[in-house]
A protein has these predicted regions:
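Helix-to-loop junction immediately C-terminal to a conserved catalytic motif
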Residues: 51
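Conserved ABC ATPase "signature" region
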Residues: 111-129, 182
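ABC ATPase "signature
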Residues: 219-220, 228
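Conserved ABC transporter NBD signature motif
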Residues: 59-67, 76
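Conserved catalytic motifs of ABC-family nucleotide-binding domains
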Residues: 155
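Conserved ABC ATPase signature
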Residues: 134-138, 142
């Protein structure tokens, strides 16, 4: 099976500081991959390269076997859903308007998207009666569910999630983790998740990519990283997470 997203020798620097060393990485359709590692290790940079919010200095980013270029970047973004930590909701728009914004942006008939909105409310467990509330009138968990619906509105082939649960309290976070896992399974969604949390990565992802200082240290299942660490950093990272949990 051909990868849906592929990076070939991709690197990126910021003001002379290397954010991502030359990297080869492929993402298979229907799988959830977690990018995990300390702050500044290149996880979010990698996501922004995939969705063409950043451009590589060297190497190629491929989507569906085609190079991502300035000429086709808008089309690539239409086929990708993007969810960030704080959601990026517009405070002056209702939940409904925030979700339907993607339809308008890409020229879809909003009236035809109402059925899709109903489906997403059920899928994300968002109460329909709250659709006409503004973000300030919603809880943190509800706001993030609105952001998730917006990311899924156009039935994206790939869903990118950049620390989507990091700002939520533990109980809300746990509930959303369960819902995300169910959504990934029901939609057979190709998803790339950025997180600091090894437990979250192990729960949600089919495979984990551990990064450090702009490089991939190890790729495998949670059991691979735990039982067969490829580098001392892998064990250090996992042990630090265990210590922080108590």
């Amino acid at each position: 099976m051909q990868p849906l997203v592929e990076l070939i020798g991709v690197s990126k620097s910021f003001d002379g500081t290397i954010g991502l060393h030359p990297t080869d990485l492929a993402f298979q359709p229907g799988l959830t991959t977690a990018l995990i590692g300390p702050s500044g290790c290149g996880k979010s940079t990698l996501l922004r390269l995939i969705i063409a919010l950043l451009w590589p200095e060297k190497g190629r980013v491929l989507f569906d076997q085609k190079d991502v270029t300035e000429a086709n970047a808008q089309e690539v973004r239409r086929r990708i859903g993007y969810l960030i930590q704080e959601g990026g909701l517009f405070p002056h728009l209702t939940a409904r308007a925030n979700v339907l914004l993607m339809s308008r942006h890409f020229g879809r008939d909003v009236s035809q998207m109402q059925q899709r909105l109903d489906e997403l409310c059920a899928l994300s467990r968002f109460p329909r009666e709250a659709l006409d509330r503004y973000p300030a009138e919603l809880s943190g968990g509800q706001r993030q569910r609105v952001s998730l619906m917006r990311a899924l509105m156009l039935a994206p082939e790939v869903l990118l999630l950049d620390e989507p649960l990091g700002a939520l309290d533990p109980l809300v976070r746990s509930a959303l983790q369960r819902d995300l896992k169910e959504i990934f399974g029901r939609l057979k969604q190709t998803a790339i998740l950025v997180t600091h949390d090894m437990g979250e990565a192990a729960y949600l992802a089919d495979e984990i990519v551990l990064m450090n200082e702009g490089r991939i240290v190890q790729r495998g299942t949670a059991a691979d990283l735990r039982d067969r660490p490829a580098d001392p950093f892998v064990s250090e990272f996992i042990n630090a997470q265990r210590s922080a949990a108590f």
